[in-house]
UniProtKB/Swiss-Prot annotation:
The protein's name: Thymidylate synthase
One CC-aspect GO term: cytosol
InterPro entries per record: Thymidate_synth/dCMP_Mease, Thymidate_synth/dCMP_Mease_dom, Thymidate_synth/dCMP_Mease_sf, Thymidylate_synthase, Thymidylate_synthase_AS
Organism per entry: Brucella canis (strain ATCC 23365 / NCTC 10854 / RM-666)
Binding site for dUMP: 21, 166-169, 177, 207-209
Any single Pfam family the record assigns to this protein: Thymidylat_synt
Gene name, Swiss-Prot/TrEMBL: thyA
HAMAP family hit by this protein: Thymidy_synth_bact (MF_00008)
Residues that bind (6R)-5,10-methylene-5,6,7,8-tetrahydrofolate: 51, 169, 263
Pathway(s): Pyrimidine metabolism; dTTP biosynthesis
C-alpha cells in the first residue's frame, strides 16, 4: 500500500523528535489522514507480512465485549500480553466500552448494537458513532484507547467508516488498525445489506518510535504488491455470530516480517 509508505516517509522527513510516555522517544507529526477504497482490495500491508490471525481474533474479541486476554491466548494471540495483570485482565478497555458503556443511571449501553439498529432504521444519521474514550474510566484501563472513536456514513448503498486514532504507532500498530477497521466495516456492511465503501484513517499524534527508524527505512525500500481479496462467509447475518473460520484472505503475497520492539 503506497498510502502507508507515504505516511512512513512523511513522518521520517517532516516529523518532530519528542519524548514520550514509554521513554523510548518518537518522531511524530500531528494530524494525518489516509483513505482506502475497500472495493480495490483488502488494505493489508504487502511490504511486510502481517499476522492476520491476530487481527481477526482481536476484532472478534472486541465485539464480544471481552477485556480478559484468555480468549486471545487460547487462539495464539499475544499482542495484549504486556499490558494484562496477573489474572489476564485489562480493565474497562475497548470491548467493555463498545458493548457495555456505563451510564450514570446504572444502565449499560451497547454502542455496537445501537449502531446496527440505527444503520437499519436511520442510515442517513450523522450520529453513527462508537466511542472507546470514556474519561471517567481511562485511569482504570491498562492502556488508554489509541483508536478511540469511529463514525459510519452511508451513501449510494455503500458503508464507509472514519476512525480517529489519538495515538498512532505507525510501524507496529497502524497496519493492524487499518486491517482491523477495514474488516469491521466489511462485516457491518454485510449484516446491514450494504456494500463496503471507504475506510478513512485519521491520525492525531502519528509517530515512529526511535528504535523503529531502521526498520521503517528498510520497509521503504520494498515495492507494494497487489492487494489481496477478503472473503467473508455470506451466510453470516449477525455481527456477533462471526467466527475466525468465516474469513479467508486470497492472494496475499507479502515481503518478510520486519521485527521491532514494542514500547510498553
Amino acid at each position: 500500500m503506497r498510502t502507508y509508505l507515504d505516511l512512513l516517509q512523511h513522518v521520517l522527513d517532516h516529523g518532530v523528535d519528542r519524548d514520550d510516555r514509554t521513554g523510548t522517544g518518537t518522531r511524530s507529526v500531528f494530524g494525518y489522514q489516509m483513505r482506502f477504497d475497500l472495493e480495490e482490495g483488502f488494505p493489508v500491508l504487502t511490504t511486510k507480512k502481517l499476522h492476520l490471525r491476530s487481527i481477526i481474533h482481536e476484532l472478534l474479541w472486541f465485539l464480544k465485549g471481552d477485556t480478559n486476554i484468555a480468549y486471545l491466548k487460547e487462539n495464539g494471540v499475544t499482542i495484549w500480553d504486556e499490558w494484562a495483570d496477573e489474572n489476564g485482565d485489562l480493565g474497562p478497555v475497548y470491548g467493555y466500552q463498545w458493548r457495555s458503556w456505563p451510564a450514570p443511571d446504572g444502565r449499560h449501553i451497547d454502542q455496537i448494537a445501537n449502531l446496527l439498529k440505527m444503520l437499519h432504521t436511520n442510515p442517513q444519521s450523522r450520529s453513527l458513532i462508537v466511542s472507546a474514550w470514556n474519561p471517567a474510566l481511562v485511569d482504570e484501563m491498562a492502556l488508554p484507547p489509541c483508536h478511540c472513536l469511529f463514525q459510519f456514513y452511508v451513501a449510494n448503498g455503500r458503508l464507509s467508516c472514519q476512525l480517529y486514532q489519538r495515538s498512532a504507532d505507525i510501524f507496529l500498530g497502524v497496519p493492524f488498525n487499518i486491517a482491523s477497521y477495514a474488516l469491521l466495516t466489511m462485516m457491518i456492511a454485510q449484516v446491514t445489506g450494504l456494500k463496503p465503501g471507504e475506510f478513512i484513517h485519521t491520525l492525531g499524534d502519528a509517530h515512529i518510535y526511535s528504535n523503529h527508524f531502521e526498520q521503517a527505512r528498510l520497509q521503504l525500500t520494498r515495492t507494494p504488491k497487489k492487494l489481496p481479496v477478503m472473503h467473508i462467509n455470506p451466510d453470516v447475518k449477525d455481527l456477533f455470530a462471526f467466527r475466525f473460520e468465516d474469513f479467508r484472505l486470497d492472494g496475499y503475497e507479502a515481503d518478510p516480517t520486519i521485527k521491532a520492539p514494542i514500547a510498553v
